[in-house]
Amino acid sequence: EMTSSLVGSEMCIRDRRSRAQQKANANVVFVDENIFPQTLAVMTTRAVPQGIELRVGKYKEFEPSQEVFACVLQYPNSNGSVEDYTEFTEKAHAADCKVAVAADILSLALLTPPGEWGADVVFGSSQRFGIPMFYGGPSAAFFATKDDYKRTIPGRIIGISKDAYGHPAYRLALQTREQHIKREKATSNICTAQALLATMAGFYAVYHGAEGLRNIAGRIHSTAGFLAKELEKLGYTQLNKDYFDTLKIQLPAHVSVNALREIALECKVNLRYFEAGQVGVSIDETTLPTDIGVLLYIFAGAAGKDYMLDESIPAQTYFDAKFARTSDFLQQDVFKKYHTETELMRYITRLGRKDVSCLLYTSPSPRDSTSS
C-alpha cells in the first residue's frame, strides 16, 4: 500500500496533467492528514527524487490550485472514520486534479467503492484477504484505475486472447517495463515480486465469493458496533460517526490512559494510543466474543467498574445508509464454484497442471509487485 501510494501519484503526473498544469510545472500532491502514518512516511521519502512536493492537511479545508495535480485520501481513514469524499472529488476534478484513494479492500464488500464516487486511482493492501500478518509483511498490493489510464499503469498487464486453435490463451497485453521498451518511456522498474501473496489473496476471494466476503465484513462491522455500544454504557465516547472496523475512543475525565495501558498489557492486548489521549481499537475476522469480553474487561477495569459479557453479538449496520454498497462484485463464474476445500484444491491442481502457477516460467507472469 505504501509503495502504491507514490506509484499512483507518479501515474497521475505522467501524461495526465492538463496543459495548464504542465505549463505551470504542477508538482504538488495534496495528502489528507488522516492517511496511515506509514504510508505518509514512504510517500515523503520517495517524493523527493521524483520532484514531487507533498502538502498534508485537512481534506475539508483543501482548495485546489494550478500547482496541485493529485490528491491522496484514506478510506476508511487512519482514525477508522468513513468520510464522504464525493464533494471533495467533484471539487478536485473541476480543477483537473486527480484523486487517488488508499482503501481497505475488505471494507469495500460493505462500503461504496471509491470508483463509484469518482476516484481515479484506488490502491491498498490485499493482506486482509487471507494473508497472515507475518510480523508486518510481506503482502501484495492491489492497484486499480480507469480504463483511460491503462497505458500509464506501471508494470505488465496480462490479457486473454486466442491461440492458433481458437482456444482462450493468456498473453502479455501491455509491456510497459524497461525490459521491453526504452527506459525513459517505462512506467516501472520495480522487481520485488509478491506474486505468491497476490495468488493467495486471489484464491481467498475465489473460495469465499462475494457472499462470503460480505458475511465476513458484516461480522467484523457488527462486532465493532457492539463493542462501541458496550463502551458507551461504561462511560466512554466513540468519536467516529461512521466506521467499518475501527473505533476511536475518548476516555472519561476520571480514567487515566496509563491505567488503561497497564491493564491492557497485563491482558497482552495491543491498543493504539493517540497523542491527544484517545484510544484506538480495531476488529478483524479473527476477533471472537471472548476477545470482546477481554477488551470490555480492560476498559471497565480502567473506569473502576465491573463488566460481564452475557449476550450474543447481533448482526447490525452502524454506518449511514449513504455509504452502503449497492453494486455487485465478483460475479464471474470462478467466484461461484469453488466454495469447499476439496473443490478449491482440485481447481488449484488443474491450474498447476496447465502451468498457470509460479512452479515454472513457461506461462506469462508479471513477476512485478505493481502488477499483481
Which ranges hold each PLM region?
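Single conserved hydrophobic/aromatic residue that forms the stacking wall/gate
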Residues: E1-I13, Y361-S371
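Flexible, glycine-rich loop/tail regions that form catalytic "lids" or insertion modules at the edges
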Residues: H221-A228, L251, R261, T317, ...
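Flexible inter-domain linker/hinge segments
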Residues: D291-L360
